[in-house]
Structures are given as C-alpha cells and as structure tokens.
C-alpha cells in the first residue's frame, strides 16, 4: 500500500492517504487509466487532465479525501 501525506483542513493536520485505494476508485469512476508522472510522485493525469495533489484529484471526482485516509481504510 502506497501512502502519502495530505493536509486536512477539517482535522487541521496532515493525514496519511492510501494512494492505491484512491487511484483504484478514480480508475473505476473514470473508466480510464490514471497516469502517474515519473518526475513527481503526486502528479497524475486522468482523461488528459492533470492533477498536482491527491486532494485536488479526489475533489475533481467528488470524493472525500478522508475516506482514503489510512485510518478509514483500515476500519
């Protein structure tokens, strides 16, 4: 499981995001491939649109980044 830190405005702290789970959900919703940049681990593109943070990606697909925090995934 790949994780990344993302600042949570709600919790006012950084949370660990399960990147693999987030990308799997995006892949299923968009029905297209998620392409990750080799130069920047947080830079991805979906359907030709580029996203620079995990929060930006989740928001674009109307997902709550907190649903992909490590503590939520392990529940």
Curated annotation (Swiss-Prot):
InterPro entries, A to Z: Uncharacterised_YodD
Biological processes per GO annotation: cellular response to acidic pH; cellular response to hydrogen peroxide; single-species biofilm formation on inanimate substrate
Protein name: Uncharacterized protein YodD
Source organism (scientific name): Escherichia coli (strain K12)
């Amino acid at each position: 499981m790949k994780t990344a830190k993302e600042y949570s405005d709600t919790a006012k702290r950084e949370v660990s995001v399960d990147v693999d789970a987030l990308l799997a959900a995006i892949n299923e919703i968009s029905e297209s491939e998620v392409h990750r940049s080799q130069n920047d681990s947080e830079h991805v593109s979906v359907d030709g649109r580029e996203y620079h943070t995990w929060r930006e990606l989740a928001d674009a697909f109307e997902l709550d980044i907190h649903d992909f925090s490590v503590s939520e995934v392990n529940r």
